[in-house]
Amino acid sequence: MTKIETLVERARRLKEKGLTTEEIADELNVSRETALWLITRVGETPPSDIYVEWRELTKPSRLRLVAMAMADMIVSEVKEDIEVVVGIATSGIPLAAMVAEELGCEFTIYYPRKFKTDEEKPKGGILSENFARVSGKKCAIVDDITSTGRSIKEAIEVIEANDGKAVCAAVIVNKRGGNEIEGIPLLSMLKILRI
């Protein structure tokens, strides 16, 4: 089975489990357009995208090392003390919790708009009320991969709407390019650039 066939099969299984196209895209670390193509196979060739397989890093001992490196990157690049690490659901949560522990600060979760029903989407994403509050605090946003930057942009807006200050975003893989989102630094352990 080729990598594309494997992705098509994974997308099909996720769809059968009831996941939306956006949730499948998040689970497979591909764009929404690519996830839709994997499900429907409309058109001969897939959209231009880069698939990132980072499953080997998700073993807790390995993820801890990634979190240590990410925390070090944040401390090196950001001159302000981080008070809250905001993990973007779902794949950014475990990494963000470990980064918060490394930085010795609080942790919370941001649920992006893409995980809401169509009627809930106009209200935007939300910060969890079960974890730290961001009001009056300097925040670092953490996710595994950014493709468009949409979830990070939403998180910045929600943090600011809750009287917090987003001072940076950090990801393992940056598929979108660029070094900032909404005026804050976008720190990337790996940046993928098309030539």
Swiss-Prot record:
The keyword Transcription regulation applies. SUPFAM superfamilies: PRTase-like. Keywords: DNA-binding, Transcription, Transcription regulation. The keyword Membrane does not apply. GO terms for molecular function: DNA binding; orotate phosphoribosyltransferase activity. It holds the Pfam family Pribosyltran. Signal peptide: none annotated. Contains an N-terminal DNA-binding winged helix-turn-helix domain and a C-terminal regulatory domain (or effector binding domain) resembling phosphoribosyltransferase (PRT) domain. Belongs to the purine/pyrimidine phosphoribosyltransferase family. GfcR subfamily. This is Transcriptional regulator GfcR. It comes from Archaeoglobus fulgidus (strain ATCC 49558 / DSM 4304 / JCM 9628 / NBRC 100126 / VC-16).
